[in-house]
A protein has these predicted regions:
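Helical hinge/lid and interdomain linker segments adjacent to catalytic or ligand-binding clefts
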Residues: 31, 40-119, 297-298
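C-terminal domain-boundary segment and adjacent tail
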Residues: 66, 241-251, 269, 273-295, ...
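A glycine-rich, often tryptophan-bearing local segment used as a flexible ligand/cofactor-contacting loop or short
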Residues: 85, 89-169
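Metal-dependent polysaccharide deacetylase catalytic core of the NodB/CE4 family, i.e.
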Residues: 117-119, 123, 284-403, 498-507, ...
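Catalytic beta-strand/loop cores that center a nucleophilic Ser/Cys/Thr
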Residues: 144-215
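Non-catalytic propeptide/linker segments at domain boundaries
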Residues: 198-254
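Catalytic grooves of carbohydrate-active enzymes
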Residues: 254-264, 268, 371, 378-393, ...
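Catalytic domains of cell-wall/extracellular-matrix polysaccharide-remodeling enzymes
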Residues: 364-453
């Protein structure tokens, strides 16, 4: 199998107020409002952000409603414990009724990025008098990038809990893969407003508030759901939601590890080495199993098509027998982890290609339906069951499938263990030529999501995986992602008070013909996560978030 790294990127305070309790005895009621303009090519972008926020709220026992801000009705904020407004579209008109209700309510309100000027500069509201801070301006790039100065800089570094979380960007080819815009605010009355988090502009040495709180009102200088990463300011919203909702979870940092793409071609010797290492360290682990191996084009079999059902997969069953006896738990990782007899997009081989998404055309596969996907899931479950295996969770191949496929999985698995791609429609049209196009957004989680937008329970994988440049063997595998990179991700992830360090590892990195230091680097990474103070846990036994003592 060819190793692949699929990086899922997003295309994309002190006045009297009434908290709603420290211990969560009833669901939090939350309203997420988003911009929904009827013109332009970003009509659904804020909806995508709203889905991502809704997912994070699924870490709590929460009832969440999503609604265009244009449809806001008078008095709605009083029906919810917390209302969030995602200002994702510049100067999208915010209803005056909403601003009036925000000004008068004692309920929690969180405003992100754009359009605060419509509220703060409106003479009908004494914004500065009420909240103790002012809105100054919108800031973006320090200058337009040029060949001579391709990285002019912007406010890109968020300081939080002693760590510098930097927005991801890449100036190659003149493309900046980050959102440089922030809303700049100024504290006018420290008795009313507090700058909770700071954002810095390293090129100009300027600082600005990233999060301001004035009693029940919170303001974020940007929308923290664009271009997210494991070292990004996205971790701030993941953590500080505990304070916004005023529902605290037990502070603990746990770690999980999963062996990936374990199929009929796995070498039992590599699984023995990996299993023994973890077993001797008393570290639980999971195994992502592909039940039915297919190479319909003969890509790795000299041009001859090859299929191996689990019942015939002698090497795989030997490996699983050894690993499960040492604590390994089974995750079902697709049925075949490839699609049809075609390249989708690489080889058509199990573990290499997408199964439930046409990645070549970036659309659902032709057969896509809940029934079609369900039949594949049932076939995979049957192969596992007939051979004595019961998976505790589902993992989508390459973390991307259609909404129909996701719903098929929800009805069959209580738990998933993965990252997820979300869509702004159940039958998404992602073509750039469509002015009202949909958006697909990839999201990882630093903690357990009890219920996401599609109804899934999601165990986190948030660090990524070790990758090596083996382009001399496979020209398309030319990417290095080191154990040190994952260690850095784990270190940054500690800002989340109940965050995980969860990663996966491909056993084939131990294959002699590949010639990488896979085993040594795996050991180093496990030791590094230990040294950071994480506690290894069995993914199959991870329960709901626990309230703080």
């Amino acid at each position: 199998m060819k190793p692949r790294l699929y990086a899922i990127a997003v295309a994309i305070c002190v006045v009297l107020w009434a908290p709603f309790g420290h211990a969560q005895t009833t669901p939090v009621k939350a309203l997420v409002l988003y911009d929904a303009p009827t013109t332009g090519s970003f009509q659904k972008l804020s909806f995508a952000y709203a889905i991502m926020l809704r997912n994070l709220l699924g870490h709590w026992n929460a009832d969440v409603d999503l609604q265009p801000v244009e449809q806001y009705a008078s008095g709605q904020v009083e029906q919810y414990d917390a209302t969030f407004y995602l200002g994702g579209i510049y100067d999208n008109q915010v209803p005056l009724t909403f601003m009036g209700d925000v000004f008068n309510t004692q309920k929690t309100v969180v405003w992100f990025k754009y359009n605060l000027w419509q509220f703060a500069w409106n003479p009908n509201f004494d914004f500065a008098g009420r909240y103790g801070f002012t809105y100054s301006a919108l800031r973006g790039m320090n200058a337009a990038p040029t060949a001579e100065n391709p990285a002019p800089g912007f406010f890109d570094t968020v300081d939080y809990k002693g760590k510098a979380l930097v927005k991801y960007y890449d100036f190659q080819n003149g493309t900046i893969n980050a959102d440089p815009d922030i809303g700049v605010t100024t504290i006018a009355d420290p008795a009313k407003a507090t700058q909770l988090v700071t954002i810095r502009n390293p090129k100009t040495n300027e600082q600005a508030p990233y999060i301001v709180r004035s009693g029940n009102f919170w303001y974020f200088a940007d929308v923290p759901f664009s271009y997210i990463g494991p070292r990004d300011r996205y971790l701030v919203i993941c953590d500080i939601l505990h304070d916004i909702l005023n529902v605290q979870h037990r502070k603990q940092h746990r770690a999980m590890v999963r062996f990936e793409d374990v199929s009929a071609l796995v070498l039992p010797s590599t699984m023995r080495r990996l299993s023994d290492f973890l077993f001797n360290r008393d570290i639980p682990f999971s195994i992502a199993v592909i039940p039915f191996y297919r190479d319909p084009l003969g890509e790795f079999n000299g041009g001859t098509p090859m299929e191996v059902h689990l019942a015939e997969a002698t090497r795989l069953k030997r490996a699983l027998k050894y690993a499960t006896a040492r604590g390994g738990k089974i995750v079902m990782h697709g049925y075949t982890h490839q699609y049809d007899a075609k390249r989708n997009p690489h080889s058509g081989v199990s573990g290499d290609d997408f199964e439930f998404w046409d990645i070549v055309d970036n659309t659902p596969v032709l057969e896509d339906s809940v029934e079609w996907a369900g039949a594949r899931l049932d076939a995979g479950l049957l192969e596992l069951k007939q051979n004595g295996y019961t998976p505790f969770a589902w993992e989508t191949p390459h973390y991307q499938s259609s909404p129909n496929s996701i719903r098929a999985a929800v009805s069959r698995f209580k738990t998933t263990y993965q990252r997820v791609v979300y869509y702004t429609d159940d039958t998404p049209d992602l073509s750039a030529s469509n002015p009202a196009r949909d958006f697909a957004v990839g999201q990882f989680f630093p903690y357990v999501i009890e219920k996401d937008y599609y109804g899934q329970r999601v165990l986190p994988e948030n660090l990524g995986n070790i990758e090596y440049d083996i382009s001399d063997i496979d020209p398309t595998s030319n990417f290095n992602y080191t154990w040190q990179d994952l260690r850095l991700n784990a270190n940054m992830g500690k800002v989340v008070r109940d965050g995980f360090a969860s990663f996966f590892f491909h056993p084939f990195w131990l294959d002699p013909e590949i010639g990488t230091p896979g085993m040594a680097d795996f050991r180093r990474l496990v030791n590094a996560i230990d040294a950071l103070g994480y506690r290894w846990v069995d993914a199959s036994r991870v329960g709901a978030p626990q309230p703080a003592n």
